[in-house]
């Protein structure tokens, strides 16, 4: 909260995404944004935008929120980074359910349902990128941990709709808790957003350089 009110997620994440785009482009990395204004795009439509542009990575920025049933929920804060896989804990399931419900509620539409064959093919495509997604999540979490004023909540996994149709290494970053006053102030500040953008951009560059070296080594005659 800032000045006693909960911040709208898009008011935080859109400026972050634009700053991140600028930092990535400084590092020679081209960026495709799924949206540049506070418009609603169904979760299942975002991955295909990246697929159509043959993107190498998919990064989704979000703000977390405490469960209203938690005691002292407003004190919960910190950063966590997710990749797509089966949730292992109740908290991972909670975050995935929260994110999966947001756009469906706001747009009054259901997440697109595919036929069984499409589901199987999608699962195969995601499994191919599971290790790469986990590696990217580790790098991003490590960089953000160094600048975030709250605790590191670690790298986690869950079934996020926004990641399911991105056929490439993909992560979702819960940058902080909008329900925590300190996290919200930091995420809403120019300095905080700059730290977030620089940290993620540095992690993405490190990831791309690592996998480029690994690919060159693998194909060396």
Regions found by a protein language model. Give the residues of each.
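Short, basic/glycine-rich phosphate-binding loops at helix/coil junctions
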Residues: 116-120
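Catalytic-core regions of hydrolytic enzymes
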Residues: 1-114, 127-138, 194, 198, ...
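Active-site-adjacent mobile loop/cap segments within catalytic or ligand-binding domains
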Residues: 6, 67-68, 121-221
């Amino acid at each position: 909260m800032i000045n006693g009110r909960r911040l709208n997620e898009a008011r935080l994440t859109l400026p972050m995404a634009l700053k991140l785009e600028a930092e990535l482009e400084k590092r020679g990395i081209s960026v495709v944004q799924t949206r540049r204004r506070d418009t609603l795009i169904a979760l299942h439509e975002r991955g295909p935008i990246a697929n159509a542009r043959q993107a190498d990575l998919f990064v989704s920025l979000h703000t977390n929120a405490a469960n209203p049933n938690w005691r002292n929920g407003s004190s919960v804060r910190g950063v966590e980074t997710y990749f797509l896989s089966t949730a292992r804990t109740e908290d991972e399931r909670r975050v995935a359910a929260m994110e999966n419900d947001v756009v469906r509620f706001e747009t009054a539409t259901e997440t697109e349902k595919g036929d069984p064959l499409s589901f199987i093919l999608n699962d195969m495509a995601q499994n191919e990128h599971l290790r790469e997604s986990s590696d990217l999540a580790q790098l991003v979490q490590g960089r953000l941990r160094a600048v975030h004023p709250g605790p590191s909540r670690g790298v986690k996994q869950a079934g996020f709709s926004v990641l399911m149709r991105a056929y490439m290494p993909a992560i979702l970053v819960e940058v902080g808790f909008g329900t925590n006053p300190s996290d919200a102030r930091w995420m809403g500040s120019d300095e905080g957003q700059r730290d977030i953008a620089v940290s993620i951009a540095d992690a993405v560059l490190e990831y791309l350089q690592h996998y480029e070296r690994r690919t060159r080594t693998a194909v060396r005659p």
